[in-house]
């Protein structure tokens, strides 16, 4: 990203936006102001927080999605397995770990720590599909927040504020769709359509 002219500023919180006469002028941050003619909001589960700073209400809710990874085993899975009715997915990493997840906590939250009942549900569904999973030790779990749109469809569009663009509401598919969403979002911003 660096070689393409992108600056990634870590631990830098957005505190507001500079909007004048319906046109975006910049972003206010904990490390100073950044002037820009075009700004894209693509912030996973924090979209509503930033939208509220702009007096916008979006049709998305923030939820926690958990995942876990097992000890490594010999290669057995070269694709992603999903079970929609059970809210479960599984793939195998290059190191042989089984990466699993799928269900979300049943309430809106910005917390990034999971709970055991949700993880148990995911693993129960996984074992029902692939019984060999019951023999594996889980090495770690983690959670991350994401935007969920009401119909499960992502939102990539310009807003009523000239120069401000949205990429949100990806639900379960955000990580898997990141490459395509990046190209689409870049096109939307560059072409303003």
Task: Label each residue range with its predicted role.
Residues 72-163:
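Active-site lid/adjacent beta-loop-alpha segment flanking the redox-cofactor pocket in flavoenzymes
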Residues 58-60, 135, 192-193:
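A short alpha-helix-loop-beta-strand transition element characteristic
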Residues 1-38:
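Helical element adjacent to the flavin cofactor pocket in flavoenzyme catalytic cores
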Residues 13-16, 69, 137:
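Residues located in well-ordered beta-strands
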Residues 45-46, 124, 180:
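Alpha-helix/helix-capping structural signal
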Residues 6, 160-193:
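C-terminal lid/capping helical subdomain adjacent to the catalytic/cofactor pocket in oxidative enzymes
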């Amino acid at each position: 990203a660096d070689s393409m002219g992108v600056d990634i500023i870590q631990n830098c919180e957005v505190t507001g936006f500079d909007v004048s006469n319906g046109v975006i002028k910049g972003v206010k941050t904990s490390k100073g102001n950044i002037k820009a003619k075009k700004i894209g909001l693509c912030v996973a589960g924090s979209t509503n927080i930033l939208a509220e700073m702009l007096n916008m209400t979006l049709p998305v809710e923030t939820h926690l999605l958990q995942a876990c990874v097992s000890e490594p085993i010999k290669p057995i899975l070269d694709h992603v397995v999903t079970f929609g009715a059970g809210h479960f997915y599984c793939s195998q990493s290059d190191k042989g770990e089984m990466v699993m997840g799928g269900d979300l906590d049943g309430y809106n939250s910005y917390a990034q720590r999971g709970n055991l009942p949700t993880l148990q549900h995911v693993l129960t569904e996984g074992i029902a599909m692939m019984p060999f999973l019951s023999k594996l030790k889980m090495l770690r779990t983690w959670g991350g927040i994401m935007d969920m749109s009401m119909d499960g469809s992502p939102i990539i569009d310009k807003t009523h504020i000239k120069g401000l663009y949205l990429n949100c509401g990806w639900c379960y598919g955000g990580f898997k769709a990141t490459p395509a969403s990046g190209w689409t979002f870049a096109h939307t911003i560059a072409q303003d359509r």
